[in-house]
């Protein structure tokens, strides 16, 4: 079976890519097509929606953080037993950072690398024929990135659709569908993006409504034929992050949700066993595990409950006496001494590290990061370089007394200083690791 693939891109965030992608995934799945979803860039939330829409795990591909051979390997894995791959772009299609060619982090990099056409989603609210100038720009901006077709989104009426369609088709781009404006299709959001699929109270009915809208509005047969057959080498896992232990105690509940699908998949494929536990249910890490991993998530929304989880706190403290504990972002916040929530209430955390964080005065920290590990750790040896990102609103209000976990640089290599902390067997940082550097 040869899979076909197409990238779903747009001029900017907020154009409706996610709703269109989720709806198309479910619509094709309902037709019996073996369809899979991929999200470009560092995004934990959208792959969860892709998984709910298809019943199969999602995946992230990031051309800045992942070396080309790792991209090929992960993409090849996702195409196994699949007929159609829909790749949802982050932000605008060409948006990335100004670094080496095809390593910018943009979805356009993947279009070039994999020779995949783009389905351009245009939010035409507030315009009509002018949408054709945007489509024209996309069609001619980069000769190595092919615009396969256009989908109009948030049109106000059939007349509005006709005006936009006629103008765009005059420049030689087919319009394969038009989704009319419908507030009921909007997905709820919060400070780190969309409310996660697992927390959406009516997720399946909502995805079905999106699928109904796509079935009604988009020519699915034409879209399938526009997707390009995938034919590429299998790549390599050399740049993948190795399992941090043989048995990994993984915090997994509404407060700890951000573990990239490719990491979980690779760790299991490498022979590691993941043993989940729930701090919110006052569960401690299994003492038979080799390492405890606290991923990112939303501990600030559950700070009071975590502070009261005496069994969890005692268990992880006992675990950390002899075995490694690592926390990323939200997990790092919980490893500190205290966490101040949005209302200014201070909650005692585990105290395994000495810092304190606050969500009361929010400041967005966002961007690609290169982390040089300061000392041997579960993520690598001293001097090893990892690529990943930060995305959080919390601030460190007391840096504590611990040694840094890593020395950080931004996506262009500019130094940002020390990051995180380490003490004994415990380490943590706001940095989310994606892959080995290089």
Swiss-Prot record:
PANTHER family for this protein: COBYRINATE A,C-DIAMIDE SYNTHASE
Family listed: Belongs to the CobB/CbiA family.
Site (Increases nucleophilicity of active site Cys): residue numbering on this chain: 432
Cofactor names: Mg(2+)
Enzymatic class: ligase
Listed InterPro entries: CbiA/CobB_synth (IPR004484), Class_I_gatase-like (IPR029062), CobQ/CobB/MinD/ParA_Nub-bd_dom (IPR002586), GATase_3 (IPR011698), P-loop_NTPase (IPR027417)
Active site positions: 329
Gene3D superfamilies: 3.40.50.880, P-loop containing nucleotide triphosphate hydrolases (3.40.50.300)
Domain notes: Comprises of two domains. The C-terminal domain contains the binding site for glutamine and catalyzes the hydrolysis of this substrate to glutamate and ammonia. The N-terminal domain is anticipated to bind ATP and hydrogenobyrinate and catalyzes the ultimate synthesis of the diamide product. The ammonia produced via the glutaminase domain is probably translocated to the adjacent domain via a molecular tunnel, where it reacts with an activated intermediate.
Pfam families: CbiA (PF01656), GATase_3 (PF07685)
More about this protein: The a and c carboxylates of hydrogenobyrinate are activated for nucleophilic attack via formation of a phosphorylated intermediate by ATP. CobB catalyzes first the amidation of the c-carboxylate, and then that of the a-carboxylate.
Pathway: Cofactor biosynthesis; adenosylcobalamin biosynthesis; cob(II)yrinate a,c-diamide from precorrin-2 (aerobic route): step 9/10
GO MF: ATP binding; cobyrinic acid a,c-diamide synthase activity; hydrogenobyrinic acid a,c-diamide synthase (glutamine-hydrolysing) activity
Keywords: ATP-binding, Cobalamin biosynthesis, Glutamine amidotransferase, Ligase, Magnesium, Nucleotide-binding
Protein function: Catalyzes the ATP-dependent amidation of the two carboxylate groups at positions a and c of hydrogenobyrinate, using either L-glutamine or ammonia as the nitrogen source.
Gene that encodes it: cobB
E.C. code: 6.3.5.9
Residue span(s) of domain GATase cobBQ-type: 247-438
Domain of life: Bacteria
Lineage: Bacteria, Pseudomonadati, Pseudomonadota, Alphaproteobacteria, Hyphomicrobiales
Protein known as: Hydrogenobyrinate a,c-diamide synthase
Catalytic activity: hydrogenobyrinate + 2 L-glutamine + 2 ATP + 2 H2O = hydrogenobyrinate a,c-diamide + 2 L-glutamate + 2 ADP + 2 phosphate + 2 H(+)
Cross-referenced SUPFAM superfamilies: Class I glutamine amidotransferase-like, P-loop containing nucleoside triphosphate hydrolases
């Amino acid at each position: 079976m040869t899979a076909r693939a197409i990238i779903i891109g747009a001029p900017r965030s907020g154009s409706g890519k996610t709703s269109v992608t989720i709806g198309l995934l479910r619509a094709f799945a309902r037709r019996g097509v073996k369809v899979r979803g991929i999200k470009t860039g560092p995004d934990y939330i959208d792959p969860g929606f892709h998984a709910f829409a298809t019943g199969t795990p999602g995946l992230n591909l990031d051309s800045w953080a992942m070396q080309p051979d790792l991209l090929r390997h992960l993409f090849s894995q996702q195409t196994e037993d699949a007929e159609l791959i829909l790749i949802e772009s982050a932000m605008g299609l060409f948006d990335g950072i100004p670094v080496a060619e095809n390593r910018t982090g943009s979805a356009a990099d993947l279009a070039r690398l994999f020779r995949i056409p783009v389905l351009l989603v245009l939010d035409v609210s507030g315009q009509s024929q002018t949408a054709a100038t945007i489509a024209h720009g996309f069609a001619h901006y980069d000769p190595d990135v092919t615009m396969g077709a256009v989908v109009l989104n948030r049109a106000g009426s059939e007349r509005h659709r006709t005006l936009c369609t006629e103008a765009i088709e005059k420049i030689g781009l087919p319009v394969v569908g038009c989704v009319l404006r419908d507030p009921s299709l909007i997905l709820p959001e919060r400070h780190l993006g969309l409310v996660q699929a697992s927390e959406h109270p009516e997720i399946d009915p909502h995805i079905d409504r999106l699928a109904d809208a796509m079935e009604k509005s988009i020519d699915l047969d034409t879209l399938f034929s526009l997707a390009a057959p995938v034919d590429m080498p299998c790549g390599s896992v050399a740049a993948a992050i190795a399992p941090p232990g043989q048995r990994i105690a993984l915090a997994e509940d509404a407060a700890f949700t951000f573990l990239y699908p490719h990491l979980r998949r690779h760790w299991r494929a490498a022979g590691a066993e993941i043993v989940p536990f729930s701090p919110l249910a006052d569960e401690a890490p299994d003492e038979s595990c080799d390492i405890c991993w606290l991923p990112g998530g939303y501990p600030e929304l559950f700070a009071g409950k975590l502070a009261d989880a005496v069994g969890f706190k005692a268990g992880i403290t006992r675990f950390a006496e002899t075995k490694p504990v690592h926390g990323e972002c939200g997990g790092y916040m919980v490893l500190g001494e205290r966490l101040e929530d949005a209302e200014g209430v201070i909650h005692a955390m585990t105290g395994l590290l000495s810092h304190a964080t606050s969500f009361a005065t929010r400041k967005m920290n966002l961007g690609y990061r290169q982390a040089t590990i300061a000392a041997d750790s579960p993520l690598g040896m001293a001097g090893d370089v990892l690529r990943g990102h930060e995305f959080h609103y919390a601030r460190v209000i007391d840096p504590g007394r611990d040694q840094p976990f890593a020395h950080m640089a931004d996506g262009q290599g500019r130094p940002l200083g020390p990051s995180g902390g380490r003490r004994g067997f415990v380490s943590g940082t706001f940095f989310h690791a994606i892959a080995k550097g290089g």
